[in-house]
């Protein structure tokens, strides 16, 4: 069987083989590809398991003997000048052949649909001749372009990741009205104010809707993503499929004795939806209970702390975060780490006393999954699909989305109660072993 993956990024193993730069985003894709490449007969590739159900809604899985004959192709956006990339690579310990295809996409403006992508996908489909197309995510317009030209909904599967419509609806994350309406020079020049960012998510949601209406199958893992996808297209066949994380997170174990006292780790904080401002608002209460508390944030910095040039580029949300840091006297208590590799992320998880996911909405965040695999005590918003993967008081602590007092209480409990932290850690590892 020939399966074509359509991805949002060039996966690191492919980029390394082609001597290209690569993104560390969407690490779980590397996880599932790695599992396929390092399995001798390829029988563990979950995307292939729904092929029979494409002809027979109801989800019957096909046998391993068919999956073993799988041939994989992967399409992904590439840098300008490499749009015609079409190359067979030998990857992994078993030197499995993977057909790799590039396509052009304006990743700076994912809200814009470019019909020129359709011609490229037609070339890719004609060359690879897939039996099944598996589109990972609904966030980018290339998914709809591919599904449109393939035009075989019974053989098209979309893996639900984040859902643009829920991101758009929750984007403001309780920001004050004046902050929502504010703009910096950077925002004006890039036409990228907070309001415009939300509108772009609504535009992306339109392409997401078109995609889900043009396919027959989706994979998901939460009540949240199932409800939203079936509201958009009630005729979809929904397949439950948990994710595989990056291999680095399947080894190692959090130990409270090896953590930095008071260290709080979050994986992202560069736009409102991720809720970094909630944590900053909660810090005064947290510091009353744990004076050594401090925050480390992975990902891009929007705080404008790297000289005049970075100050000029600061967005309105970054200015708001800076004001919260000053107002709550958190200078020296917040450190933004930049983009981290999997190994670097793992080190930060293991050195932290707690991982916090304060987002306004998430489906099932990979950052929570990685923390659970390592046994890092987790505190997360009760929102979206998170309650499906975090059982409150067992595999983490939940607080109401946007309730900074509950957030502070959860963080304080874990930072000050070593026995609770150890119990959560053990339960999280048990949960993660079943889910991921």
Regions found by a protein language model. Give the residues of each.
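N-terminal subdomain of nucleotide-sugar transferases
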Residues: 1-87, 92-99
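Conserved donor-binding/catalytic core segment of Leloir-type glycosyltransferases
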Residues: 4, 255-274, 280-287, 295-298
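Short alpha-helical donor nucleotide-sugar binding micro-motif in glycosyltransferases
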Residues: 125, 347-352
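Nucleotide-activated donor-binding/catalytic signature segment of Leloir-type glycosyltransferases, i.e.
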Residues: 309-339, 343
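Aromatic "clamp/platform" in nucleotide-sugar-dependent glycosyltransferases that forms part
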Residues: 360
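Short hydrophobic beta-strand element within catalytic cores of glycosyltransferases
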Residues: 377-380
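Conserved acidic donor-binding segment of nucleotide-sugar-dependent glycosyltransferases
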Residues: 392-393, 397-404, 413-419
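A charged, aromatic-enriched C-terminal amphipathic alpha-helix characteristic of glycosyltransferases
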Residues: 419-436
């Amino acid at each position: 069987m020939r399966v074509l993956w359509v991805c949002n990024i060039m996966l690191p193993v492919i980029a390394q083989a082609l001597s290209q730069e690569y993104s560390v985003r969407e690490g779980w894709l590397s996880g599932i590809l790695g599992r396929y490449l390092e399995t001798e007969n390829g029988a563990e590739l979950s995307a292939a398991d729904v092929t029979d159900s494409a002809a027979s809604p109801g989800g019957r899985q096909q046998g391993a003997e068919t999956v073993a004959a799988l041939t994989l192709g992967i399409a992904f956006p590439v840098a300008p000048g490499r749009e015609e990339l079409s190359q067979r690579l030998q990857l992994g310990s078993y030197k499995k052949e993977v057909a790799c295809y590039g396509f052009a996409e304006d990743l700076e403006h994912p809200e814009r649909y470019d019909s020129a992508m359709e011609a490229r996908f037609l070339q890719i489909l004609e060359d690879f001749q897939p039996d099944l197309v598996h589109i990972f995510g609904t966030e980018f317009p290339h998914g709809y372009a591919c599904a449109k030209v393939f035009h075989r909904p019974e053989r098209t599967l979309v893996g639900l990741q984040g859902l643009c419509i829920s991101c758009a609806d929750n984007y403001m994350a309780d920001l004050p009205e004046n902050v929502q309406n504010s703009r910096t020079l950077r925002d004006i020049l890039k036409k990228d104010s907070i309001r415009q960012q939300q509108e772009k998510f609504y535009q992306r949601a339109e392409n997401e809707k078109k995609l889900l209406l043009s396919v027959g199958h989706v994979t998901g893992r939460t009540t949240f993503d199932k409800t939203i996808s079936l509201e958009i297209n009630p005729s979809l066949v929904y397949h439950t499929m948990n994710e595989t994380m990056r291999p680095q997170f399947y080894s190692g174990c959090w130990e409270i004795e090896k953590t930095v006292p008071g260290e709080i780790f979050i994986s992202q904080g560069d736009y409102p939806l991720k809720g970094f401002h909630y944590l900053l608002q909660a810090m005064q209460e947290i510091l009353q209970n744990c004076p050594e508390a401090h925050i480390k944030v992975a990902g891009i910095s929007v705080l404008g702390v790297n000289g005049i040039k970075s100050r000029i580029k600061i967005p309105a949300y970054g200015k708001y975060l800076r004001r919260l840091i000053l107002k709550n006297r958190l200078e020296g208590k917040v450190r933004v780490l930049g983009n981290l590799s999997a190994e670097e992320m793992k080190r930060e998880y293991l050195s932290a006393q707690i991982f916090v996911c304060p987002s306004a909405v998430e489906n099932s965040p990979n950052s929570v999954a990685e923390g659970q695999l390592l046994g890092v005590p987790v505190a997360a918003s009760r929102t979206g699909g998170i309650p499906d993967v975090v059982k409150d008081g067992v595999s983490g602590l939940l607080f109401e989305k946007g309730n900074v007092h509950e957030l502070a209480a959860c963080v304080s409990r874990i930072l000050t109660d070593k026995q609770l932290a150890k119990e959560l850690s053990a339960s999280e590892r048990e949960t993660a072993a079943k889910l991921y």
